[in-house]
């Protein structure tokens, strides 16, 4: 399953919507996504992890925003 992760790059600052970024991770569960990110070199402030259904996944592909992270 593909998950969309909304995050802030600076973990010590208050989240600001305009600074929110997203990445896409393939995993089985939300817990696995969080573990992959925490085990990587990234120190992100994760705001939300969203599983993508087929329609949403297709939309992300069509807009060209979908690029899977290799964590």
UniProtKB/Swiss-Prot annotation:
Gene Ontology CC, one term: DNA-directed RNA polymerase complex
Pfam families (alphabetical): RpoY
Catalysed reactions, semicolon-separated: RNA(n) + a ribonucleoside 5'-triphosphate = RNA(n+1) + diphosphate
Biological process, per Gene Ontology: DNA-templated transcription
Keyword terms: DNA-directed RNA polymerase, Nucleotidyltransferase, Transcription, Transferase
Position of the signal peptide: none
Gene3D superfamilies in the cross-refs: RNAP, epsilon subunit-like
NCBIfam families registered for this protein in UniProt: PRK13667.1 (NF010188)
General function of this protein: A non-essential component of RNA polymerase (RNAP).
Subunit structure: RNAP is composed of a core of 2 alpha, a beta and a beta' subunit. The core is associated with a delta subunit, and at least one of epsilon or omega. When a sigma factor is associated with the core the holoenzyme is formed, which can initiate transcription.
Name listed for the protein in its UniProt record: DNA-directed RNA polymerase subunit epsilon
